Amino acid sequence: MNINKSNLIWLDLEMTGLEPETDKILEIATVVTDADLNILAEGPTIAIHQSNELLDNMDEWCTTQHGKSGLTARCKASTYDEAYAVEQTIAFLKQWVPAGASPMCGNSIGQDRRFMNKYMRELEDFFHYRNLDVSTIKELARRWKPEVLAQVNKKGSHLALDDIKDSIMELKVYREKFFNL
């Protein structure tokens, strides 16, 4: 383990829906990379227990997707809550990055920040206020160099760890093919 302020923290949450006022977090995963996007470590992937009532009332997309991936069943069987997930995730991150140093990295992470602000504030506060949002670059590529998008091959499993790895791979493609670095 090497604590380095240049390391990047990648995070993804899976949720029961898109509204933090009514929906909840189902899963969290983190990955730490160096500044060149090489994976240094995978943090804990934690399925968070949610009530059967909440899980049974997810919208059709979430019910189908999280049922198919096995996430719904993992959440029903889990004994972990948000506080445990925060504690374990911060303990992992402190081994790699000083608090406040890394932007939050991932795809559409503004959404993750909204949920973290409500349910995982201590973890949200661990990040720098800046974001490294791969979806911003995707939107620019769609408009300025759409042929690059065909070179991004994501699994799209909607499991947090897989989604993070997809985001890292996607940014590597953009770095090479869009920014020519």
From Swiss-Prot:
Main location: cytoplasm
Enzyme class: hydrolase
Matching InterPro entries: Exonuclease_RNaseT/DNA_pol3, Oligoribonuclease, RNaseH-like_sf, RNaseH_sf
A single cellular component GO annotation: cytoplasm
EC number: 3.1.15.-
Subcellular locations according to the entry: Cytoplasm
Enzyme active site: Y129
Domain Exonuclease, residue spans: 8-171
GO biological process, one term: DNA metabolic process
Keyword Ribonucleoprotein carried by entry: no
CDD domains for the chain: Orn (cd06135)
SUPFAM superfamilies membership: Ribonuclease H-like
Its job: 3'-to-5' exoribonuclease specific for small oligoribonucleotides.
Family statement: Belongs to the oligoribonuclease family.
Protein name: Oligoribonuclease
Gene name of the record: orn
